[in-house]
Amino acid sequence: SKINNRRSNNSISKRRNMKQKLEEYFDRLWPINRSLTGNGVRKSLEILSEIVEFNITEVPSGTVCFDWTVPPEWNIVEGWVKDSSGKTIIDFKEHNLHILGYSEPVKGKFTYDELQPHLYTLPEQPELIPYLTSYYKRRWGFCMSHIEFEKLDKAETYEVFIDSTLDDNGSMTIAEATIKGTTDETILLSTYICHPSMANNELSGPLVASFIYNQLKTIPNLRYTYKFIFVPETIGSIYYLSKNGENLKENLTAGFVITCIGDPGVFTYKKSRRGDALPDRAAEIILSQTESNFNIIDFFPSGSDERQFCSPGFNLPVGSLIRTMYGKYPEYHTSADNKDFISFEAME
């Protein structure tokens, strides 16, 4: 009885420890401005490399992967809008969603009518800041709550400043980690690292993947070889497939894209395009044994990086593990996808 109690206490203490570590890493990663490329991704991977032994690759901007091209590297120092009295109306330093991702630099004075086409809001969620990007079309812009937008004075002239760079000689950063098994049969865990301060839609995936890596590292004589990739969504997995796709076709037994895994909703598993591959069967069995309530949905071609892995040229056995599906919760791609929305118990 004493031994059982000790085991139970150890288990509680380990869980508390895991939850605490998840939260500590979350707090460090949260303020960093990540995008498809740039120093925010490097800084985030540097922090996560305390948990995961990464092999990091810098892919030069302009690299062609299939019919896609790696974009210029984007970095930003500051961005703001002030009125004629010098009062700051929008400030990137207050919330990094305030900037349209990949905004080109700008400095100048604009009337309300000139500025208005560069402002983005969510009239149906008026208190929230939207998350928007323009990776492949040069433009600049700011995102703000519709409430603040409605307060703008139409007779004002506004001073606008964005200190950003788009570097054709820059690079895109991707990270890979491998835990070698006794066979070359491979299980892939893929997550993306490319969004600014959003909790569920950005940080839940890399955090959960990092701690899965950490747990697997402690298990001796694993049969499968585990590959973990942390890549900018879409372009990162397309680049990865351009380099490793043939090898994956040969050795990949199962793969999972981990995304939106931090909210308190029930598990959702999105099947691979094959529909009856090993990960599809395994997910169904495990969820039915461990969860009283869950969703299993068929593959559809939009979504996250499963669309690249399951694309016709590869058709790999890769499904997606999610809690509440992207686009199905109102906080998605807004400033409400924050620490209050997620649950560290759910991530554990």
Language model regions located:
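Short, Lys/Arg-enriched N-terminal segments with co-localized hydrophobic residues
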Residues: 2-17
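N-terminal hydrophobic/helix-forming segments and targeting peptides
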Residues: 14-348
